[in-house]
């Protein structure tokens, strides 16, 4: 009896949905859609790497495309012009976030910044982060930490260079980014404290990203608890909760350590600043911080802080290893500009190596850390490229597809940093063909901090070392296969042999 009623409900719901869609399409000029199946819509056309699936569909359907993922309509943007309309022209109306299961859980009910819907609370949190944690004065105070950690990296790589053994650069560069982040945020040295198990931290970061970007049935079949039931049966609820508990244990340990009255307060890190604000806030203060807010914001800082540096360094070294002429060119510039026999690299050296900046831009173009940025949700009716997008509609901007658009880029699949010579295109959110940090109100607030880690790390790798392939490998053997959802990592770890330059 119950099954019969459920089937009757689904048939009725689907029928009404089809009728409703036809009425809406006759009133509105909705974006084109690829053919879909009953109930699941276009879900069967989305593979393990959604950004690649969406580009293939957009090539046949259009650069403003309406997909039906289960019962949920999603607009996918795949052109520079459409992205500019969403992120600049209609930024205010398109800058909220959808209520998704994974992001709601990991953000503790939207007590973070990245996944919180747009509103006064979000504005206060962003104002706090930009004004207190990512201001110029704070960023300058973090530079010394970055330089010290890069020096430690050079020392460890030099030890590996003695016996000419391959180094897992994927692990090494994750360790560098995590080490810098842990000192800046937690005041703890990654390699001199209990946080020495990089594999566990790496695993936790990847699991957290997967949880935040996961395709759960509850998000696409929200009617009558059907999606929730499927997620429960499949174990998705348990997987998400396990990640949350592991992340919470780490953050609680850090907060407990900072709350210890005997702890030295000579140098205030990010957690110290947040706890001070929480303890001193008054009941009439516009910014309200609780322990959950601190944990939510720290989650954003950890994930984004490690990813921007580590993943982009890994992809950059991958492309340079695959293109030895470009590797030679960028190393030649670095060593000519900085001179011989340098013992350390400093922040002042970053402005002396313009070709390295072009290499980084080209890496951002081919390998944006978050290929679909973060999902947006409309707060009002807007028109994009002449198409109607109603309120409460999810929007995904395919930055990865835009970065490989043959209408914008010559030889779009090739790694050619020279394409940016004399080009005004930059990555700070004003040029919509290159969007590694997003744009508009939702642009990444930690962009400057992430760039400093990335630039210093690469400068040290390329100045102090030449890089050889392991025995038996050729440059063509280095693959660029991807893995991930919200962010995309190199699936097969990059392993190279460091050769210390005298």
Swiss-Prot record:
EC number(s) given by UniProt: 1.14.-.-
Gene Ontology MF term list: heme binding; iron ion binding; monooxygenase activity; oxidoreductase activity, acting on paired donors, with incorporation or reduction of molecular oxygen
PROSITE patterns per UniProt: CYTOCHROME_P450
Keyword Nucleotidyltransferase: no
Main location: membrane
Membrane topology: Single-pass membrane protein
InterPro entries noted in UniProt: Cyt_P450 (IPR001128), Cyt_P450_CS (IPR017972), Cyt_P450_E_grp-I (IPR002401), Cyt_P450_sf (IPR036396), Cytochrome_P450_71 (IPR050193)
Membrane-spanning segments: 1-21
Enzyme class, first EC level, given as a word: oxidoreductase
Needed cofactors: heme
Pfam families xrefs: p450
GO cellular component terms, A-Z: membrane
Annotated positions binding heme: 444
Subcellular location: Membrane
Keyword Transmembrane: yes
Keywords, in A-Z order: Heme, Iron, Membrane, Metal-binding, Monooxygenase, Oxidoreductase, Transmembrane, Transmembrane helix
Similarity remark: Belongs to the cytochrome P450 family.
PANTHER family for this protein: CYTOCHROME P450 71B11-RELATED, CYTOCHROME P450 71B16-RELATED
Protein name (record): Cytochrome P450 71B17
Species of provenance: Arabidopsis thaliana
Gene name of the record: CYP71B17
């Amino acid at each position: 009896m119950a099954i019969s009623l459920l089937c009757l409900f689904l048939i009725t719901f689907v029928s009404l949905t089809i009728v409703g869609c036809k009425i809406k399409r006759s009133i509105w000029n909705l974006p084109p859609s690829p053919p879909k199946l009953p109930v699941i819509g276009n879900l069967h056309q989305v593979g393990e790497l959604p950004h690649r699936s969406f580009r293939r569909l957009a090539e046949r359907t259009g650069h403003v495309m309406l997909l039906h993922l289960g019962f949920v309509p999603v607009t996918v943007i795949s052109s520079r012009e459409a992205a500019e309309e969403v992120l600049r022209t209609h930024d205010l109306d398109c800058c909220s976030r959808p209520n998704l299961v994974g992001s709601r859980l990991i953000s503790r009910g939207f007590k973070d910044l990245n996944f919180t819907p747009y509103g006064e609370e979000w504005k206060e949190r962003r104002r706090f982060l930009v004004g207190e944690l990512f201001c110029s004065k704070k960023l300058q105070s973090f530079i010394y930490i970055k330089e010290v950690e890069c020096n430690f990296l050079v020392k460890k790589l030099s030890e590996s260079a003695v016996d000419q053994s391959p180094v897992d650069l994927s692990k090494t560069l994750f360790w560098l980014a995590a080490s810098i982040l842990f000192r800046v945020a937690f005041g703890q040295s990654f390699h001199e404290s209990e946080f020495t198990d990089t594999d566990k931290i790496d695993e936790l970061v990847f699991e957290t990203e997967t949880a935040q970007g996961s395709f759960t049935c509850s998000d696409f079949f929200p009617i009558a608890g059907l999606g929730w039931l499927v997620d429960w049966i499949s174990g998705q609820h348990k997987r998400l909760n396990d990640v949350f508990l592991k992340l919470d244990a780490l953050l609680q340990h850090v907060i407990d350590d900072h709350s210890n009255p005997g702890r030295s307060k000579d140098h205030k890190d990010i957690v110290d600043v947040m706890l001070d604000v929480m303890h001193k806030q008054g009941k009439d203060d516009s910014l309200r911080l609780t322990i959950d807010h601190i944990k939510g914001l720290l989650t954003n800082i950890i994930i984004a802080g490690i990813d921007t540096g580590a993943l982009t360094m890994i992809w950059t070294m991958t492309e340079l290893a695959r293109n030895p002429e470009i590797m030679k060119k960028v190393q030649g510039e670095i060593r000519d500009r900085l001179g011989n026999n340098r013992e350390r690299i400093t922040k002042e050296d970053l402005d002396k190596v313009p070709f390295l900046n072009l290499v980084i831009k080209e890496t951002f173009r081919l390998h944006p850390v978050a290929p679909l940025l973060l999902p947006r949700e409309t707060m009002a009716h807007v028109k994009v490229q002449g198409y109607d997008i109603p309120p409460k509609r999810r929007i995904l901007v395919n930055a990865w597809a835009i970065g490989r658009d043959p209408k914008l880029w010559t030889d779009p699949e090739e790694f050619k940093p020279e394409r940016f010579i004399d080009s005004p295109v930059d990555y700070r959110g004003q040029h919509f063909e290159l969007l590694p940090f997003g744009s508009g109100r939702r642009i990444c607030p930690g962009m400057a901090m992430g760039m400093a880690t990335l630039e210093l790390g690469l400068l040290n790798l390329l100045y102090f070392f030449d890089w050889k392939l392991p025995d038996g490998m050729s440059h063509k053997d280095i693959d660029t296969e991807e893995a991930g959802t919200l962010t995309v990592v190199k699936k097969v770890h990059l392993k190279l042999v460091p050769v210390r330059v005298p």
